[in-house]
Amino acid sequence: MITEAGGEPVHCGVAPDDAAGLQAALARCQNAELILTTGGVSMGEADLMKAALSDGLRFHKVAVQPGKPVALGRLFGKPTFGLPGNPVSCLVTFQQLVRPVIRAMLGLARPFSPVIEAVLTAPIRKRPGRALLARARLHRGDDGAVHATPARSQSSGAMSGMVEADGLVILPLEAGDAAAGEMVRVQVLRWRFMDRAEPGYWREGAEAEAPYGSSAPGSGEDDACC
């Protein structure tokens, strides 16, 4: 994921579940331009990343599912993300938070993945109070519209739905259940569902829409992947 975003990953090892070992592992990362960790950001006794970031902590937890237990701070003067240890939550928070930062640090003008509209083929249950990024498969229907079929399980432990997902259906904080047939916004993860005529396609001179409504100006360079 780091390579696809344009970065160069450097693995600094696995940290033990104790404060001294974690600090030693983090010290090995101090020459990086951006530090990423996975795990240790929730509420367990061994979740030590929040404390490690205490002096430079910017936020801990976001109102998004999956991916609530995520942290951002600074270590050694470098931006540092503490991503959830759950694989699905880690993948989603990387896509939403880390990938745009890497691309912005590289000076790329379109950090966000494109967002399109699609017709929901099955209902998605959701309670207001937290945004939901629901994994879905996309296909183009006989009507020419893109249709989004949500994964059967939206559990953050269901990796199969993430592997098969072509996009993430965006249901905002205040939204409730989404019904079949409803038009929804989808963040595209796989290019084959992008038509060059559709808003959000990263063509020369175009603008890519950010997942939550803001946009980034196009630069004329042609990205190979979203």
Q: Where are the model-predicted features located?
A:
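Loop/helix-junction capping segments adjacent to catalytic residues or to phosphate/diphosphate-binding pockets
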Residues: 19-20, 43, 91, 178
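Phosphate-binding glycine-rich loops and their immediate beta-loop-alpha structural context
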Residues: 1-37, 42
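Flexible glycine/proline-rich
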Residues: 52-205, 212, 225-226
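Residue-level recognition of oxygen-bearing side chains
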Residues: 21, 48, 97
